[in-house]
A protein has these predicted regions:
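N-terminal glycine-/serine-/threonine-rich beta1-alpha1-beta2 phosphate-ribose binding loop
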Residues: 1-112, 130, 134-138
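Redox-cofactor binding/interface segments in oxidoreductases and associated redox assembly factors
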Residues: 94-95, 118, 175
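Short helix/strand-capping hinge loops at secondary-structure junctions
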Residues: 113, 119-121
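Rossmann-fold dehydrogenase core element
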Residues: 131-149, 169-173
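Predominantly a Rossmann-like dinucleotide-binding segment in NAD(P)-dependent oxidoreductases
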Residues: 149-236, 242, 361
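Contiguous beta-strand/loop segments that form the cofactor/metal-binding neighborhood of enzyme cores
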Residues: 202-307, 312, 317, 323-363, ...
Length: 380
């Protein structure tokens, strides 16, 4: 019998609420996940997570660090280290912190012999990615980077046709992802500063990765310019950015990103991809409108993004829907991405269970190489 793996999520913010915890709760239902722990800087987000899923996941719970009853003003920046140190070896750590903190949390997980699911981008420096890749492979630990756009059916279809030569060779493209304006009033204002990151790094990486995923072409050169602005707390950040990416065959991708899609818009963001390809005597085209997917809802109350009432609804990324079991189940390529990484970790541990350490390490490394070569899940 395949044993479930325990999961510790480090970070209790937006992505944990919107995707990670409900996905992991459902995987707990199906026997992939056992114990769930969540670490956060303070108690308020943990309290919100405790209260947010009773209808969808009746009877399911997690252990909060610190306790959700702790005084909200108390901060625990290093508590996650104690929690990771107490975990049984070779379970799963989900890294869902602000981008500049990914490196130290991933490294702490590896030092404690844990497999890792990390939200994108994994780290902000190439040298850090190389360091993580080496340490993880030396220990036979899997690192999966949660680039969920890879699991969008339209991306998988495009990849297959590109592999078959149906488009020709990618030469020129443009992409766009403008996130909602209300992000500026969120915790972003505390970490999304000019010295730390910008919209291209934060969300533009989705499309840089997606073009590589579809074509197999690796980026070799990147240049970025940005427009600065002030957050409500006075911190300065890049609110807008445009990046130009050169791929190994000379192809060019322009990527425009920002924190500025109108809160009153149907959005909830603006995102799209267009790729032109050269063939023999003709050209090919891949065009994805990733914002409008054919569904419009107008609510009686402001339950949409930023309190909006009229929304373009994305049924493909992540939604909680009725199913034959209790509560609701998550569906969509966001859930598929999380499930693929955690299922892979469970598969690795099942294959290595009961083997002597040297054989176990060799078996884990073999599966890690297999997943790398398949290149569906993003890895270092």
């Amino acid at each position: 019998m395949t044993r479930p793996i325990d999961v510790t999520i480090v970070g209790g913010g937006m992505i944990t609420f919107d995707l990670l915890l409900p996905s992991i709760y459902h995987l707990q239902r199906t026997g992939v996940i056992g114990r769930i722990d969540i670490c956060a800087l303070d108690s308020p987000p943990l309290k919100a997570l405790k209260e947010g899923f009773g209808q969808a996941f009746p009877g399911q719970d997690f252990t909060a660090h610190p306790s959700e009853t702790e005084e909200p003003q108390k901060k625990y920046p290093d508590l996650y280290k104690e929690v990771l140190a107490a975990m049984p070896k070779r379970q799963a750590v989900v890294v869902a912190m602000p981008d500049p903190l990914h490196y130290e949390v991933v490294m702490e997980a590896l030092r404690n012999d844990q497999h890792v699911l990390c939200v994108k981008p994994m780290v902000l420096q190439y040298a850090q990615a190389v360091e993580i890749e080496k340490l993880a492979y030396d220990k036979g630990l899997f690192i999966g980077i949660e680039y969920h756009k890879r699991f969008d059916r339209r991306a998988l279809i495009a990849r297959r046709h590109y592999e078959l030569g149906d488009f020709g060779e990618f030469v020129m493209g443009e992409a766009k992802m403008i996130e909602p304006y209300y992000y500026r009033a969120s915790n972003f204002q505390n970490w999304f500063t000019c010295d730390k990151t910008d919209p291209f790094v934060y969300v533009g990486c989705h499309y840089v990765d997606l073009v590589q995923f579809i074509t197999g072409l690796r980026p070799v050169q990147v240049s970025v310019v940005g427009v600065k602005g002030k957050f409500p707390n006075g911190n300065e950040g890049f609110m807008w950015a445009n990046g130009r990416v050169i791929y190994e065959n000379g192809a060019i991708l322009s990527v425009t990103d920002g924190l500025g899609y109108p809160d009153e818009g149907a959005g909830s963001n603006e995102q799209c991809l267009m790729m032109f390809c050269e063939g023999e005597g003709k050209t090919g085209l891949i065009a994805h409108d990733d914002q409008f997917r054919g569904v419009e809802h107008s609510y009686l109350r402001g339950i949409g993004c930023a309190g909006s009432t009229f929304n373009y609804v994305n049924p493909d990324f992540y939604r909680l829907v009725p199913w034959e079991g209790p509560g609701y189940q998550p569906v969509g390529y966001g859930f598929d991405s999380v499930a693929a990484i955690l299922n892979t970790i469970q598969r690795i541990e099942h294959a290595a269970a009961g083997l002597p350490e040297a054989e176990s390490l060799a078996r884990r490394r073999a599966i890690i190489k297999e997943v790398d070569e398949k290149a569906i899940i993003a890895t270092p």
